Design a protein with these regions (language model features):
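A short, well-structured juxtamembrane/interface segment
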Residues: 146-163
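Short, structured loop/turn "capping" segments at alpha-beta junctions
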Residues: 123-126, 154, 193
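Short gly/ser/thr-rich secondary-structure transition/capping motifs
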Residues: 22-28, 148-152, 196-201
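Glycine-rich phosphate-binding loops that contact phosphosugars or nucleotide phosphates
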Residues: 1-138, 172
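Acidic catalytic cores of enzymes that act on phosphate-bearing nucleotides/polynucleotides
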Residues: 161-201
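Adenine-nucleotide phosphate-binding core of ATP-dependent small-molecule kinases
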Residues: 138-146
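A general structural signal for well-ordered alpha-helical packing
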Residues: 140, 154, 179-183
Length: 201
């Protein structure tokens, strides 16, 4: 879910920062990633904060002499001890296994913290940031309509949907991270065979 949140924030971050953003699993970073620009910031995300793979990724970044930041909902997160800076995901603790607030919360936290950094560095103006925030609030305000439309859609297709033995979630461009996260949530909650694809694949 944290990886998907990074993918979800990526396009916005590249647009605002005018910098290349790479998303990868912490184990891949720890085991094989070489970073040649020592001004690189590596952000380790873990909603629960105790992910040992995220700790290993942050430690690998430190060993390479890179900047590190940790993001977690947990105020006493282990990942906070392995990064230079820490930022809380303010969504509250989710008691169920399928983390839904954490996905949205991590995505927005990344967007906000790096927008503030961009403002401080003179990369992004306050006026532009206000425009982005207005668009975000508009999307959030439209969520009840989306939920209602999705519920109505399910009501129309449930008799065909329930006997399914395999589910495929598709999407594209800025929604691809949502495809991956949606497939994961179906797997975690419905326990049915599910795959997420870019719609062109």
């Amino acid at each position: 879910t944290s990886y998907h949140a990074g993918l979800s924030a990526k396009n916005y971050l590249e647009e605002v920062l005018n910098l290349k953003v790479f998303c990868m699993y912490p184990t891949q970073f720890h085991r094989s990633e070489k970073v040649f620009n020592k001004k690189t910031l590596v952000i380790g995300m873990s909603q629960g904060g105790q992910s040992l793979s995220t700790v290993e990724g942050l430690d690998a970044a430190t060993t390479q002499g890179l900047y590190t930041a940790a993001v977690s909902e947990n105020p006493t997160a282990l990942v906070f001890d392995h990064a230079t800076t820490k930022t809380r995901i303010e969504v509250g603790n989710e008691k169920c296994g399928a983390k839904t607030k954490g996905y949205a919360g991590t995505t927005v936290t990344l967007m906000m913290m790096l927008s503030e950094w961009a403002i401080a560095k003179g990369i992004l103006s306050e006026e532009s940031f206000e425009g982005y925030k207005e668009r975000m609030f508009k999307v959030i305000g439209n969520m009840p309509n989306i939920v209602n439309a999705a519920t109505e859609w399910y009501g129309r297709i449930k008799d065909e949907f329930l006997p399914a033995k395999r589910i495929i979630v598709v999407g594209y461009d800025g929604n691809y991270a949502d495809v991956l996260e949606g497939a994961l949530k179906v797997l975690e909650t419905v326990r049915q065979g599910v795959t997420g694809y870019d719609i062109e694949e």
